[in-house]
Amino acid sequence: MFPANWTSVKVFFFLGFFHYPKVQVIIFAVCLLMYLITLLGNIFLISITILDSHLHTPMYLFLSNLSFLDIWYSSSALSPMLANFVSGRNTISFSGCATQMYLSLAMGSTECVLLPMMAYDRYVAICNPLRYPVIMNRRTCVQIAAGSWMTGCLTAMVEMMSVLPLSLCGNSIINHFTCEILAILKLVCVDTSLVQLIMLVISVLLLPMPMLLICISYAFILASILRISSVEGRSKAFSTCTAHLMVVVLFYGTALSMHLKPSAVDSQEIDKFMALVYAGQTPMLNPIIYSLRNKEVKVALKKLLIRNHFNTAFISILK
């Protein structure tokens, strides 16, 4: 087969989960459920943050950004797969594949930057409460959020530009359900050492370094909490950090497990199932964690329900 630049390929074919015909319907149902919960949960968090003035704080600005990128990340990966399952085609155009790969890289990278910024926000709120309004003013918060998006989008562009010139070995069959960059590299028949180096550098910048910043922030937070004399004060401080810590563990745990998986013959099959967790489960659980663990969100929802004359029986469930 003659090598060709992958931009010359008009259509790519996904193998998806066709190797597992007995569980395809189950996978489709689970993915559809996860996607719907992701959409509803994250739209709910964004909406309630906008509607309730008490939630117009740095923490909820960052949380709204997290919800927004979770919607885009999940939509870029799951919605084409669900559409292909219904239509039975399992194909994607070059432009669609490139867009899907870029969105996946950009949203994942942005979250890697945004999570340590959220940890820093919690650090300032607990360790420097009197200076918090000055340090985390509106301008600073907007700059942090914009910087996170710019960093994620630029690193994704660098990775994309390193892959586009590569030549394929006449093969356009992707052993995945999405245009994941590692799955695309499996089709390349030229040396990919430069691309692998670029990806390694970006991975180090976006995984271990943010994790280190988060650990440092929470080390200071823990030290400050232990110095709080009242039990109520400690409980309140812990509650403001628990939800973020759960999201951090969920996100980085999944990301690291994808990078530290065993190098086996069927590693591509492992990649597909782990990508489902990364693209479906994590964005789905984020709004659930923040809603159930956050008293302010519950209070805001109660106010919204009362304002719109909803059934008081439903309000009592939130108590």
UniProtKB/Swiss-Prot annotation:
Q: Which GO terms describe its cellular component?
A: plasma membrane
Q: Which residues lie on this side of the membrane: Extracellular?
A: 1-25, 76-99, 161-197, 259-271
Q: Which residues lie on this side of the membrane: Cytoplasmic?
A: 47-54, 121-139, 218-237, 293-319
Keywords, A to Z, come to: Cell membrane, Disulfide bond, G-protein coupled receptor, Glycoprotein, Membrane, Olfaction, Receptor, Sensory transduction, Transducer, Transmembrane, Transmembrane helix
What biological processes does GO assign it? detection of chemical stimulus involved in sensory perception of smell
Glycosylated residues, chain numbering = N5
> Where the protein is mainly located, per its record?
membrane
Q: What residues form the membrane-spanning segments?
A: 26-46, 55-75, 100-120, 140-160, 198-217, 238-258, 272-292
**GO molecular function annotation:** G protein-coupled receptor activity; olfactory receptor activity
CDD domains per record: 7tmA_OR13-like (cd15430)
Q: Which cysteines form disulfides?
A: C97-C189
Q: How does it sit in the membrane?
A: Multi-pass membrane protein
Query: Record's InterPro entries?
Result: GPCR_Rhodpsn, GPCR_Rhodpsn_7TM, Olfact_rcpt
Q: Which Pfam families match?
A: 7tm_4
* Signal peptide coordinates: none
Glycoprotein as a keyword of this entry, yes or no, is yes
Which compartments is it annotated to reside in?
Answer: Cell membrane
Q: Which domain of life is it from?
A: Eukaryota
User: What function does this protein fulfil?
Assistant: Odorant receptor.
Q: What family, per the record?
A: Belongs to the G-protein coupled receptor 1 family.
Q: What is this protein called?
A: Olfactory receptor 13F1
Native source species:
Homo sapiens (Human)
